């Protein structure tokens, strides 16, 4: 599998989900750690207007993780904002990992996925591959544009479900309110998140089973501006080897 689950998590964690009334630029820097040791970093810039958006980011492995596998990449999503709807136009991911380069480009037409190009071209799939169908892609968005849908209240932040496609995997990302004992300290809103693979994966793979049935993911949001919009600033992501902690800070 071509790191599909990793790309999905990257998409919804490293995103500024604000929609101001006029064009503004927001920059956030994120750091990821495991057992207190740095494993990754990312810088994201979001340009948001009343009728358009563009999100660009650079990410890289860090610390001990970089000793084992050097990863560097960029990701971009752009499109239109039409009232309360997000209409994606293009998504591009370009990264190198372990000396190999992979790229993904998704083109949208009328807000629907029109073309997907992945290089190098994926190898022939086995009988255990759950193929992505045309029906699966209906109303699907890329990982970055998905969370740009505006909300009018904090209560709505944790009551959302997104159809996401990253070029290989189609998954549903489901937000629900976190319990009283699950709140991230200092956060205005904490959501539980489930990533439910729909297609574009190998059946029986332990990573997929863990993601669907056991992964514990919490994401903290904070208000951004005076319009009731929110942005993710912290996350706890359960993995098979431990909990990854992601924290973000504004960059001037």
What are these regions (language model features)?
Residues 22-110, 152-252:
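Acidic, serine/threonine-rich low-complexity disordered tracts
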Residues 15, 51-56, 120-124:
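Short amphipathic alpha-helical segments, especially helix-boundary/capping motifs
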Residues 114-177:
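A charged, solvent-exposed segment within the mature domains of Sec-exported extracytoplasmic proteins
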Residues 17-20:
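N-terminal signal peptide c-region/cleavage motif recognized by signal peptidases
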Residues 10-14:
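Hydrophobic helical h-region of N-terminal Sec-dependent signal peptides
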Residues 1-9:
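Bacterial N-terminal signal peptides that target proteins for export
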């Amino acid at each position: 599998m071509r790191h599909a689950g990793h790309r999905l998590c990257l998409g919804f964690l490293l995103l500024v989900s604000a929609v101001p009334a006029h064009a503004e630029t927001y920059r956030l820097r994120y750091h990821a750690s495991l057992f207190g040791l740095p494993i990754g970093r990312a810088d994201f810039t979001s340009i948001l207007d009343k009728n358009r958006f563009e999100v660009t980011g650079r990410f890289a492995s860090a610390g001990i993780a970089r000793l084992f596998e050097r990863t560097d990449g960029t990701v971009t999503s752009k499109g239109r904002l039409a009232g309360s709807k997000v209409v994606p136009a293009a998504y591009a991911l370009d990264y190198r990992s372990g000396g190999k380069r992979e790229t993904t480009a998704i083109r949208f037409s009328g807000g629907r996925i029109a073309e997907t190009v992945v290089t190098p071209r994926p190898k022939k799939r086995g009988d255990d591959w759950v193929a992505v169908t045309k029906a699966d892609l209906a109303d699907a968005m890329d990982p970055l544009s998905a969370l740009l849908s505006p909300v009018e209240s904090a209560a709505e932040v944790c009551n959302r479900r997104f159809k996401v496609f990253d070029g290989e995997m189609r998954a549903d990302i489901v937000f629900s309110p976190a319990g009283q004992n699950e709140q991230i300290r200092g956060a205005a809103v904490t959501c539980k998140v489930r990533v439910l693979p729909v297609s574009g994966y190998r059946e029986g793979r332990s990573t997929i089973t863990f993601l669907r049935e056991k992964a514990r993911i919490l994401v903290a949001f904070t208000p951004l501006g005076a319009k009731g919009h929110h942005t993710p600033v912290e996350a706890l992501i359960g993995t098979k080897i431990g909990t990854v902690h992601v924290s973000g800070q504004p960059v001037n």
